[in-house]
């Protein structure tokens, strides 16, 4: 093995040692979501009349957030508000879309989707009964 080959191999190993963890982290789903959220947070403006609701990580539409939603949706002075509910799966989204199809100002997003991250950065009001990510 020549000196040049030996030095090249050592340099390659050291660079891999330094950069592989960074490359792995950048490819992770979690890092991708954090970066997307940060991009939306920087780019998007807060919408004055938008409310995001999340109950039990999107598993249901119940509890205090639902009571608040029902109260707001029935009052004429809150008609201009857009209500966005977080759901956990596509099937849940379809179920609630059908249930609330007559409400033009009610939408649903799947938890941790791009639409969810966008709504999280744009909504002036965040209503939940647990914690947001």
Regions found by a protein language model. Name each.
Residues 49-133:
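Active-site and donor-binding regions of nucleotide-sugar-utilizing enzymes
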Residues 1-48:
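Membrane-proximal basic amphipathic "stem/tether" segments
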């Amino acid at each position: 093995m020549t000196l040049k080959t030996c030095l090249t191999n050592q340099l390659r190993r050291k660079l891999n040692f330094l950069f592989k963890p960074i490359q792995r982290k950048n490819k992770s789903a979690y890092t991708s979501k954090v970066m997307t959220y940060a991009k939306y947070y920087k780019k998007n403006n807060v919408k004055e009349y938008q409310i995001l609701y999340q109950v039990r990580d999107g598993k249901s539409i119940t509890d205090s957030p639902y009571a608040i939603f029902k109260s707001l949706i029935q009052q004429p002075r809150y008609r201009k508000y857009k209500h966005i509910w977080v759901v956990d799966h596509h099937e849940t989204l379809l179920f609630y879309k059908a249930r609330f199809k007559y409400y033009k100002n009610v939408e649903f997003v799947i938890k941790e989707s791009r639409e969810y991250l966008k709504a999280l950065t744009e909504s002036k009001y965040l209503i939940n009964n647990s914690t947001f990510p």
